[in-house]
């Protein structure tokens, strides 16, 4: 008789890829292969992932002596765009016909002016930037003026960074809610993200108080189907935010991948049915640049 599967663990290693997609040139990603390129610099052991078949898909360096015991394969995204919302939605069954809007030159002046009117103060930035770079560059001016830092990326995001001692986290969240009403619900931008940080100039550090505001999924997802059939969904990490909380019975927000793995371990011991959907984001948040190769490997 076929075996019945009562629970599934779906774990996303955020930004950990094994090769470019056919549309890579559209995003300047030709030749990308996070694990493949890393393995050319530092051979990767990864015994568990090897046993599940990962090195049948990408060379991890060293000898392959572990026969695969799991099913393995590559996924290719059908939706246009490459942001977190698009990818996670597609994993749950929603294929977008049009990408979320992006702003490679920053947001139009009238959008920023309206945002500033809504929050009652000016803002800094309005550029495409990495989060760590822009708080290093504009953080001191932000601390002097009290103006939040606004930036975007290649993704459809409106990100607001603020020092927790300058703009308290609840106030930053209120700013993000105002921005989400304007650019999310009003313009279709995929996410508004609160990016609080602490520290002094030269040693700023982003905190675990990040919060994502995402659009409601544009159609029924697998999460909705599972919920309708009384199969509980546990969301770990930023997953709840990416689906605007829809179809999720319980959520565990985490401040690090260590906390995420602890939550997964706890679910292994206590959850008997349904879907446990986790995102481990530290690879993307902390280790995505070339100078962090060894940290990425050890993580």
Predicted segments with their positions:
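Short amphipathic alpha-helices and their capping/turn segments at secondary-structure boundaries
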Residues: 1-5, 138-140, 175-184, 221-228, ...
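Active-site nucleophile/metal-coordination loop of metallo-enzymes that catalyze phosphate/sulfate
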Residues: 3-5, 15-163, 167-170, 195, ...
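Metal-dependent active-site segment of extracytoplasmic phospho-/sulfohydrolases and closely related
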Residues: 9-18, 294
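Active-site regions of oxyanion-processing enzymes, predominantly non-cytosolic
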Residues: 146-149, 190-192, 264-284
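Extended, H/D-rich, highly charged conserved domains that either
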Residues: 162-163, 170-237
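A glycine-rich, aromatic-flanked flexible loop/lid motif
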Residues: 233-245, 272-288
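Functional beta-strand-loop-alpha-helix junction segments that form "active/interaction loops"
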Residues: 235-264
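Conserved small/polar residues in nucleotide/adenosyl-binding loops
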Residues: 291-298
């Amino acid at each position: 008789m076929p075996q019945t599967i009562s629970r599934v663990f779906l774990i996303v290693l955020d930004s950990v890829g094994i090769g470019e997609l056919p549309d890579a040139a559209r995003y300047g990603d030709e030749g990308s292969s996070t694990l493949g390129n890393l393995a050319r610099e530092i051979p990767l052991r990864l015994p568990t992932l090897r046993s599940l078949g990962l090195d049948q898909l990408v060379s991890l360096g060293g000898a392959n002596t572990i026969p695969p015991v799991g099913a393995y394969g590559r996924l290719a995204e059908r939706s246009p765009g490459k942001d977190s919302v698009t990818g996670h939605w597609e994993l749950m069954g929603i294929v977008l016909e049009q990408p979320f809007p992006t702003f490679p030159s920053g947001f139009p002046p009238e959008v920023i002016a309206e945002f500033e009117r809504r929050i009652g103060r000016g803002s800094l930035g309005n550029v495409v930037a990495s989060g760590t770079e822009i708080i290093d560059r504009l953080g001191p001016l932000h601390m002097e003026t009290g103006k939040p830092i606004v930036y975007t990326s290649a993704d459809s995001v409106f990100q607001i960074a603020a020092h927790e001692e300058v703009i308290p986290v609840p106030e930053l969240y209120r700013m993000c809610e105002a921005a989400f009403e304007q650019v999310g619900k009003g313009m279709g931008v995929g996410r508004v993200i609160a990016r609080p940080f602490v520290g002094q100039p030269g040693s700023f550090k982003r905190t675990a108080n990040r919060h994502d505001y995402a659009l409601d999924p544009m159609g029924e997802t697998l999460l909705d189907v599972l919920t309708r059939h009384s199969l509980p969904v546990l969301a770990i990490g930023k997953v709840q935010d990416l689906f605007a909380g829809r179809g999720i019975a319980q959520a565990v927000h985490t401040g690090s991948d260590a906390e995420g793995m602890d939550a997964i371990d706890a679910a292994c011991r206590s959850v008997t049915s349904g879907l446990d959907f986790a995102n481990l984001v530290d690879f993307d948040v902390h280790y995505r640049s070339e100078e962090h190769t060894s940290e990425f490997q050890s993580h």
